[in-house]
């Protein structure tokens, strides 16, 4: 039998070598052999050691011994402010890789590890202290963590405080520095059962020292999400508060909140604003609502589904009570949804249905002045506009009445509409022609005019249109391309294409993003994909799936009550009768801001 040829190279490694080396160095230290430096801790206690071991274990000692300072050659180095027992632990760690962190040594050991640059020991101390957080020490622990740049511990302390803010004592909260209180109020994770509690927290802090703190009240009130404070509380308490009544910036915030609750504030036509985002602990969430459409078999649907992007959950809402037919239009006005017109194939509808999200039911409201189908609807300044080729009318939900307006100057077929910067825009092809145009309606003059915005993109027919952050987005129905128009600058742009086409899909703005759902994809298969576009990252991502593949459905966003998202072990901030105008015994949350009456 032929012997195998000998190997030219035999790779070898000993997995126990590192541990054996550490043991050998530790033994040399115990036997006091080859020691070449002595560290003197606070109090004069000496610790002989090996320079090479210290330099390998700590960037602090590496810089000390490798540089040109006197300590690089000195046989004795004095370490000011390092307790001897902490230096002992760090030296033992250098030679063994082990350290025992306890309640007695965690804080001083973290200080010493931070000073002498032992990051692993510092991290271990921080992890130990995270487990020791409680109501008595959480505020001080956050101060300590931030002072020593211990980010993990600082974040854990903040989460604990936000989660247990309702259990902290009044004295603890009132002694907070302004910057810290603002940080808590601005955080989505502040655990309050309703926004009035956040308002009371800010007010209590100011009232603890009015002469010094009153000047900070506008800044604090801006951090409170006033649009989600109940309407009666806004009128009875916020508006009546002298700190608000005497402050123009505060009155502007109050007016913004009241406009929001009266559906006069279009949050999609503004830039991102934290005040328009409810806190998860209150149970309110901005949701995507899908109405009607057709399924795989082209059967008409009367289902109404809602999607919570925070949890990824779908829920059923009250079904549409009548035959939807086709050619209807869907729009959200405040937190209610309106379905206008349509037909059954032989008869046009003038009926208007309203979905009241606070009670989860559909009711019929005043009919349109004219029956119509394949029209478009939008909301501008709290009023509902319906636009068709030959007529325009406007609905006032406060009076439940319709008003005829000037029709478009140039009739358009199957137009789409959106409100932007105080104007109503209609996009479509001129009646009987293939020419695509944009017309604009001015509510102050009741006049339509042609928009001269240069060469339009090559649309085959009217794209789906929505306004987000003051920009108009146009999603093509026959391709994945998306165009953007800035009416203020009169500029066109193109954003990255969608992941797929959505022929017959639906478009809505929600939470500062665009949501496109359903329709037929690139392979002509009916799709259940929901994808979202984030303007900050300029990227599309698939965020969910429809309950079933659907097309020709409508989608809008509203705020509605979901289960409060309170972290485990947390309790919402509650106001007791001794320090609040709110009845702490009644914490039923409103279904939406319009219930705040």
Curated annotation (Swiss-Prot):
Keyword Transmembrane helix assigned: no
InterPro entries: BACK, BTB-kelch_protein, BTB/POZ_dom, BTB/POZ_KLHL21, Kelch-typ_b-propeller, Kelch_1, KLHL21_BACK, SKP1/BTB/POZ_sf
Sequence ranges assigned to domain BTB in this UniProt record: 35-103
Pathway: Protein modification; protein ubiquitination
Compartments reported by the entry: Cytoplasm, Cytoskeleton, Spindle
GO molecular function: cullin family protein binding; ubiquitin-like ligase-substrate adaptor activity; ubiquitin-protein transferase activity
PROSITE patterns tied to this protein: BTB
Kelch-type repeats, residues: 287-335, 336-382, 384-422, 423-470, 472-512, 513-560
One Pfam entry name: Kelch_6
Domain BACK as annotated: residue spans: 138-239
Residues covered by region (Disordered): 570-597
Protein's GO biological process: cell division; chromosome passenger complex localization to spindle midzone; proteasome-mediated ubiquitin-dependent protein catabolic process; protein ubiquitination; regulation of cytokinesis
Protein's name according to its UniProt entry: Kelch-like protein 21
């Amino acid at each position: 039998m032929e012997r195998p040829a000998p190997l030219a190279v035999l790779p070898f490694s000993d997995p126990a070598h590192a541990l054996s080396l550490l043991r050998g160095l530790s033994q040399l230290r115990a036997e006091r052999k080859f020691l070449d430096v002595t560290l003197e801790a606070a109090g004069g206690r000496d610790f002989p050691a090996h320079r090479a071991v210290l330099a390998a274990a700590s960037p602090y000692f590496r810089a000390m011994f490798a540089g040109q300072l006197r300590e690089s050659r000195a046989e004795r180095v004095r370490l000011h402010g390092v307790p001897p027992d902490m230096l002992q632990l760090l030296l033992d760690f250098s030679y063994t890789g082990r350290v025992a962190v306890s309640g007695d040594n965690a804080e001083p050991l973290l200080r010493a590890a931070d000073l002498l640059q032992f990051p692993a020991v510092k991290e271990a101390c921080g992890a130990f202290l995270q487990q020791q957080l409680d109501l008595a020490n959480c505020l001080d622990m956050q101060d300590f963590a931030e002072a020593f740049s211990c980010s993990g511990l600082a974040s854990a302390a903040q989460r604990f405080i936000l989660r247990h803010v309702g259990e902290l004592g009044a004295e603890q909260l009132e002694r907070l520095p302004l910057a810290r209180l603002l940080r808590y109020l601005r955080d989505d994770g502040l655990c309050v059962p309703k926004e009035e509690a956040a308002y009371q927290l800010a007010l209590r802090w100011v009232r603890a020292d009015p002469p010094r703190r009153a000047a900070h009240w506008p800044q604090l009130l801006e951090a409170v999400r006033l649009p989600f404070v109940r309407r009666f509380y806004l009128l009875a308490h916020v508006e009546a508060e002298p700190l608000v009544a005497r402050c123009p910036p505060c009155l502007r915030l109050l007016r913004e909140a009241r406009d929001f609750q009266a559906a006069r504030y279009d949050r999609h036509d503004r830039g991102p604003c934290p005040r328009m985002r409810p806190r998860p602990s209150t149970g309110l969430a901005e949701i995507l609502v899908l109405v009607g459409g057709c399924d795989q078999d082209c059967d008409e649907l009367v289902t109404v589904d809602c999607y919570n992007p925070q949890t990824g959950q779908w829920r059923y809402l009250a079904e549409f009570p009548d035959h939807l037919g086709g050619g209807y239009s869907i729009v959200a006005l405040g937190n209610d949804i309106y379905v206008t017109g349509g037909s059954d194939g032989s008869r046009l509808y003038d009926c208007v249905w309203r979905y009241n999200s606070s009670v989860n039911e559909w009711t019929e409201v005043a009919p349109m002045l004219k029956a119509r189908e394949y029209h478009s609807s939008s909301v501008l300044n709290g009023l509902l506009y319906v636009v068709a080729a030959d007529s325009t009318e406007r609905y006032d939900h406060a009076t439940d009445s319709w008003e005829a307006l000037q029709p478009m100057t140039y009739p358009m077929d199957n137009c789409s509409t959106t409100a932007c910067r105080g104007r109503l825009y209609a996009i479509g092809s001129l009646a009987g022609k293939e020419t695509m145009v944009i017309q604009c309606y001015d509510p102050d003059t009741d006049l339509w005019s042609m928009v001269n915005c240069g060469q339009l993109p090559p649309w085959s027919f009217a794209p789906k249109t929505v306004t987000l952050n003051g920009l108009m987005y146009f999603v093509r129905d026959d391709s994945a391309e998306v165009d953007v128009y800035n009416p203020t600058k009169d500029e066109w742009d193109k954003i990255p294409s969608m992941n797929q086409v959505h022929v017959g899909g639906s478009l809505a703005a929600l939470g500062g993003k665009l949501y496109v759902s359903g329709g037929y994809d690139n392979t002509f298969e009916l799709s259940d994909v929901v994808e979202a576009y984030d303007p900050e990252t300029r990227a599309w991502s698939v965020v969910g799936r429809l309950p079933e593949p659907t097309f020709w459905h409508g989608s809008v966003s509203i705020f509605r009550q979901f289960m409060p998202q309170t972290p485990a072990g947390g309790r919402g901030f509650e106001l007791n009768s001794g320090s609040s105008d709110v009845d702490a015994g009644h914490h039923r949350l409103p279904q939406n801001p319009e219930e705040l009456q």
